[in-house]
Swiss-Prot record:
Database matches in SUPFAM superfamilies: RPB6/omega subunit-like (SSF63562)
Entry keyword annotation includes Thylakoid: no
Keyword Transcription annotated: yes
Family affiliation: Belongs to the RNA polymerase subunit omega family.
Listed name of the protein: DNA-directed RNA polymerase subunit omega
Subunit structure: The RNAP catalytic core consists of 2 alpha, 1 beta, 1 beta' and 1 omega subunit. When a sigma factor is associated with the core the holoenzyme is formed, which can initiate transcription.
Amino acid sequence: MVDKTQGIIDPPIDELLSKVDSKYALVIFASKRARQINDYYADLHEGSLFDNVGPLVDSTIDDKPLSVAMHEINEDKLVATPIVEPAAS
């Protein structure tokens, strides 16, 4: 049995867009999480384990942080909540 190829086309963009308000929100959300994952691996290399949260889905060291972030969003491990800014007086 051949495993399903994973990458930027998996999970499908339509499934990801159902989790957020817009494409822009998806890009910002996924990129911020990918940066956290990247920082986690850098901290792991330096011996510091408690500064960042690692991947919340099964992944290997070869998986790109952005792909891991997309899988986390698709599996509802992360939820985007809009920031409500106070009204100007």
